[in-house]
């Protein structure tokens, strides 16, 4: 039986305090999940629970919660996440640190890349908006994000932070990510279709490939260095 791909962590700085628990394959969460996360999950904020997934997000930024909820849902993750941040300054530290913490947890939970597909891509629409995402579990952190957002903010999240969130996740998770919104008139739709496309691409990339158990998907023979 394969080991669970999960991780729980706390990331504390003078600017933010992030707690999260992640299971890449959904289902149950790690046994060391912080009790406060389980309590927060009962609040119903940006959350849903089923036998296959448990999701609850509360960063203090509603639109960021919405994007991370969509990302976790369509990636097939179970994810509990809370953040107490210095929102009296602005949204930058909270949005950035949450995505760094999520990337750190993802990298820890994934462990070895042996046996996975490594590459994933997806197109996802939301009404008139269409986005494309391509992911490589490469251990070579890089991101190109072109969403063409025109508004200053969506809800309480600065539009300049939306690509920065994806870049922060890519850096911490050590993924190569390309995401672009091909068309769309509504910035909410453009952003959400991008997060959904990224989620489906990640889900494909980390999927196990039958018959390639233990095989590293690289001509180098390793994705660790």
From Swiss-Prot:
Q: Which InterPro entries match?
A: IGPD_sf, ImidazoleglycerolP_deHydtase, ImidazoleglycerP_deHydtase_CS, Ribosomal_Su5_D2-typ_SF
According to its UniProt record, the EC number is 4.2.1.19
- Alphabetic keyword roster: Amino-acid biosynthesis, Histidine biosynthesis, Lyase
The processes (GO biological process) annotated in the record are:
L-histidine biosynthetic process
Pathways per UniProt: Amino-acid biosynthesis; L-histidine biosynthesis; L-histidine from 5-phospho-alpha-D-ribose 1-diphosphate: step 6/9
Which residues fall in a coiled-coil region? none
Entry annotated with the keyword Lyase: yes
Q: Which Pfam families match?
A: IGPD
Output one GO MF annotation. imidazoleglycerol-phosphate dehydratase activity
The answer to keyword Amino-acid biosynthesis applying to this record is yes
Which domain of life, per UniProt?
Eukaryota
**Catalysed reactions listed for this entry:** D-erythro-1-(imidazol-4-yl)glycerol 3-phosphate = 3-(imidazol-4-yl)-2-oxopropyl phosphate + H2O
Annotated family? Belongs to the imidazoleglycerol-phosphate dehydratase family.
**Matching HAMAP family:** HisB
What is the protein name stated in its UniProt record?
A: Imidazoleglycerol-phosphate dehydratase
Native organism is Pyricularia oryzae (strain 70-15 / ATCC MYA-4617 / FGSC 8958)
What gene, per UniProt, encodes this protein? PTH3
């Amino acid at each position: 039986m394969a080991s669970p791909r999960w991780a729980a962590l706390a990331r504390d700085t003078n600017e933010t305090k992030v707690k999260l628990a992640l299971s890449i394959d959904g289902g149950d969460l790690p046994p060391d999940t912080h009790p406060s996360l389980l309590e927060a999950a009962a609040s119903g904020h940006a959350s849903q629970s089923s036998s296959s997934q448990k999701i609850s997000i509360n960063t203090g930024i509603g639109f960021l919660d919405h994007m991370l909820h969509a990302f976790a849902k369509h990636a097939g993750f179970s994810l509990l996440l809370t953040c107490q941040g210095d929102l009296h300054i602005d949204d930058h530290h909270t949005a950035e640190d949450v995505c760094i913490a999520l990337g750190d947890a993802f990298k820890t939970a994934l462990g070895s890349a042996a046996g996975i597909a490594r590459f994933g891509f997806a197109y996802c629409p939301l009404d008139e908006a269409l986005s494309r995402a391509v992911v490589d579990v490469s251990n070579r952190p890089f991101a190109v994000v072109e969403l063409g957002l025109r508004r200053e903010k969506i809800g309480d999240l600065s539009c300049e932070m939306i690509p920065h969130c994806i870049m922060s996740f890519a850096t911490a998770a050590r993924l190569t990510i390309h995401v672009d919104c091909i068309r769309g008139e509504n910035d909410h739709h453009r952003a959400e279709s991008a997060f959904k496309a990224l989620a489906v691409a990640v889900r494909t990339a980390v999927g196990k490939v039958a018959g390639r158990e233990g095989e590293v998907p690289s001509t180098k023979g390793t994705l660790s260095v």
